[in-house]
Amino acid sequence: MSDSPLVQVRDLVKHFPVRGGVLQRTVGWVQAVDGVSFDIRRGETLGLVGESGCGKTTVGRLLLRLIEPTSGSIKFDGVELTQLNGASLRPYRRRMQIIFQDPYASLDPRTPIGDSIGEGLRIHGLGTGPERREKVRRMMDLVGLMPYHARRYPHEFSGGQRQRIGIARALVLEPDLIVCDEPVSALDVSIQAQVLNLLNQLQRELGLTYVFVAHNMGVVEHISDRVAVMYLGRIAELADRRDLFHQQEHPYTQALMSAIPIPNPELRRQRVILKGDVPSPVNPPSGCRFHPRCQLRQQLDGPAICAQAVPPLIELGGGHECACHFRQPGGATPEEIARSMSAVGTPGR
């Protein structure tokens, strides 16, 4: 894994219009992604996690330009993708691929899987017919499929086999970056492990870079090098996998981790119970978007700054970043930070 970034994202925003009335006029905006910034290093796996509706899948699709950003910057290998269109974007589409969540819905039921895997080669005009068939055969072998499978249709395969087909289709163009959009969430646990191990093996052999979108923290721990935790369109915490699972800094991450079961009946994890529902992205809370449900804010008697100011994503040390007013470099406790804010006149209660 290289320290040089393959992808650099800065202040990425995506708002979807909400339309209503007879004329279908825009009556509001869904703030799906709101000011997200991060880097993806070459050869690493960056996990994107969070509850449903947090914006993690939207981020993955924005990276691939499957949907257009409202604003912000996406640099791939030093090139600003948001400035490219049509023919100028085409060479970069070859270098970025996606593995979809539903391995059946993402395959054409009327097309033999050999043709589906080789479709990218045909679209980009790569190779002759025999060369494409040989490339498809090699990709199928790489993911554990047999040559005779090429003539079969998607309904003839199990869920795990269909996901292997999706992986082969993503690999056939020899991409640098693959966005894995919850690729194992629809599979049985035993099949999940097989697919995750396959992805790890392919990354080692081919030098791939992954963005792994998931809501299962156990899966993310197994495959990721770094993890970004999202909440309502923003990154709450970003850290090395080992650091994040050893010491969570953001209250939301702490709540997520407390829900992971421990496979030992004699050990118990202290659960953090979040009150209330996730707010609507059409009308998100002001300030820190987590503040209406935040257990730390409740412990500190409701500091006003949480509702008044957006906390920046700051580095606490060792590449561990957190967006919380009461987490700062140096190891001060939230209570100490709250007292220092009161002393200098920062809004308290």
State what each model feature region is.
Residues S2-P5, V18-Q24, W29, D240-R349:
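Short catalytic/signature loops enriched in Gly
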Residues V22-V27, L81-Q97, I123, G129-P130, ...:
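ABC ATPase NBD coupling module
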Residues E51, V179, P183, L187, ...:
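P-loop NTP-binding/switch modules centered on Walker-like glycine-rich loops
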Residues G72-E80:
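Conserved ABC transporter NBD signature motif
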Residues V79-E80, E131-Y148, Q201, Q254-S258:
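Conserved ABC ATPase "signature" region
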Residues Y153-F157, Q161:
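Conserved ABC ATPase signature
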Residues V172-D176:
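A short, proline-enriched helix->beta-strand linker immediately N-terminal to the Walker B motif
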